[in-house]
Amino acid sequence: MLIEIPNVFSKEEVNQLREELDARTWIDGNQTSGVMASTRKRNQQLDKDDPVALQIGELIMARLLAHPLFVSAALPLQFYPPLFNRYQGGETFGYHIDNAIRSTSEGMVRTDLSATLFLSEPDTYQGGELVIQDTYGQQSIKLAAGSLVLYPSTSLHQVTPVTSGERTAAFMWLQSMVRDEGQRRLLFQLDQSIQALTAQAASEQELFNLTGVYHNLLRRWSEL
């Protein structure tokens, strides 16, 4: 399941974030790569311990945890804190699948879901599409600045070469309360239906029944 979430941050907020990020020292992105990824990856990143990156990462996580669509789709349990990358001058990241487990200072995170928050407007750079291969085929993603795409970490994906301009983004992984992607999809569809029926003033009994089904399935499938 691939979900696009528009306007996580406003244009004004993105401009402020970019001013802070652009002023930092960017390093070779392969300093965070495994052996296989290092042969396919050419980009720049901020150090994971950069204080500004950490501060903005906290802001991103807080914003996402307050976003109903993100919470409904991801059912987040634990984040691997956001990182920041930049592509320019032909830089690219060829097809790969993200590592299954990530280590943080607080323990291990199983990467159930990956997310990219775009911080460059699509008309300011050429190339740089996030191409994701999933059960519905290949999808090419290039969103407005401030918008986010969420997709299963099991997906084969790449960032195509940026042939002009500059593509800056935040990327992150998270462990969901529900490990299985198919179960998460069913819960998401059910939750969206409940919200739609609520907006249509459906009968109270119908909503009680559906909400009960949702929470009983979540109780059965969740791992905490």
Swiss-Prot record:
HAMAP family for the chain: Hydroxyl_YbiX (MF_00657)
EC assignment: 1.14.11.-
Cofactor(s) in the UniProt record: Fe(2+); L-ascorbate
Transferase as UniProt keyword: no
Top-rank taxon, per record: Bacteria
SUPFAM superfamilies the record matches: Clavaminate synthase-like (SSF51197)
Cofactor: how bound: Binds 1 Fe(2+) ion per subunit.
Single GO BP term: intracellular iron ion homeostasis
Residue ranges annotated for the Fe2OG dioxygenase domain, each copy included: 78-176
A GO MF term: L-ascorbic acid binding
Organism annotation: Shewanella sp. (strain MR-4)
Keywords: Dioxygenase, Iron, Metal-binding, Oxidoreductase, Vitamin C
Protein name: PKHD-type hydroxylase Shewmr4_3244
Ligand binding (2-oxoglutarate): 167
Pfam families (alphabetical): 2OG-FeII_Oxy_3, PKHD_C
Residues annotated to bind Fe cation: 96, 98, 157
Positions of disulphide bridges: none
